[in-house]
Structure formats: C-alpha cells, structure tokens
C-alpha cells in the first residue's frame, strides 16, 4: 500500500491529458492515470483502516489524484467528520512529502471551500486545549505556512496572534 503511494509521489505536478487526445503520449497518459488511481485507492484503504478503529468518525471522500488544472497532485487527503455540518472543523488524514521523505499526518482541519464565518474561529479553539506530546502547529499567515513547535509558550503566543488576526488559520498535526 505505502509503496504504491510512494511511487505515485514521483509523478506529482506532471500534466495529464486525455489519452485519446494525446497522440504519441497515449501510453504515458494511460500509465499516469493508472498510477494515480492506484495510489488514490491505496490512500483510501489506509483512511478506511484508520476509520475502522474510530467508528464515531465518518469518512468523507478522498481527494482526486489530479487537480482542476489536470496536474497530478503532490498529496491526497481524506476528511473524517464526527458530527455537525461540513463547515465544522474535522479530522483530516493528509499525505505529504516526496518519495524520499513522505508521511501521513492527522490534523484538525476543515474543508476550505465549505467554510463559513465561524469556521476559522471554531478551528482556532484547538489553541484552548493544553499541549500534548507528539503534536505541532502548522500556522498559515500571509499566504505562507510554517511549522511551530507545540509548547505552552507557543500556544499562548499563537492564541494572541489569532485574536489580533495576524494568523489566518492554524492546524494541529501529529
């Protein structure tokens, strides 16, 4: 399963075209589609395995293997919803990295295109919880993201920055 996902990551960013309209590259496009579909299936199976141990969470659809520009995605994700609306924060299993250094993160996140006026405030409530071992914060501000160590001092600093709207969103990852 993980080998299929690792192999797919080396194709991230490649432009995909309909094989029937690709001329000499038809076989290459068929192979890319096969690699993408197999990797997505493997990631979906991984997410199902996780969800089977956490029955209170409902698995949502896995992201597609290519984006709207028809480039092979550099990652996959699957949301797990516990209760409430799709505007509520959820858990997300997310593939990240490159073939030589990749992993799966579990994070408190939300579906960006389905957020409402309260979503970011609700999601920032993760900063009201005490720090636990094995987590870190992924902070988004000014269109950039960066990793912040999960310490009590950083948690309090990030809470203040969220209040002052210096930070757009923050994810808790492990």
Which residues are covered by each model-predicted region?
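N-terminal domain-onset segments
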Residues: 1-61
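Short glycine-rich, low-complexity/disordered patches
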Residues: 45-65, 132-148
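Amphipathic, interaction-prone secondary-structure segments
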Residues: 57-95
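Compact, glycine/acidic-enriched structural inserts
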Residues: 34, 100-166
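Polar/charged alpha-helical tracts
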Residues: 7-10, 31, 48, 78, ...
């Amino acid at each position: 399963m993980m080998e299929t996902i690792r192999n797919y990551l080396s194709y991230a960013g490649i432009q995909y075209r309909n094989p029937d309209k690709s001329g000499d590259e038809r076989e290459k496009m068929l192979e890319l589609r096969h690699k993408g579909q197999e990797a997505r299936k493997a990631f979906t199976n991984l997410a199902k395995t996780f969800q089977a141990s956490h029955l209170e969470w409902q698995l949502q659809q896995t992201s597609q293997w290519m984006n709207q520009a028809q480039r092979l995605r550099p990652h996959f994700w699957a949301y797990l919803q516990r209760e409430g609306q799709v505007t509520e924060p959820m858990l997300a299993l997310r593939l990240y990295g490159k073939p030589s250094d990749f992993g799966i993160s579990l994070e408190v996140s939300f579906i960006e295109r389905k957020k409402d006026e309260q979503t970011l405030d609700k999601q920032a409530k993760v900063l009201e919880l005490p720090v636990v071992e094995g987590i870190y914060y992924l902070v988004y501000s000014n269109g950039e993201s960066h990793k912040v160590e999960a310490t009590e001092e950083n948690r309090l600093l990030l809470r203040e920055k969220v209040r002052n709207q210096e930070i757009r969103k923050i994810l808790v990852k492990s």
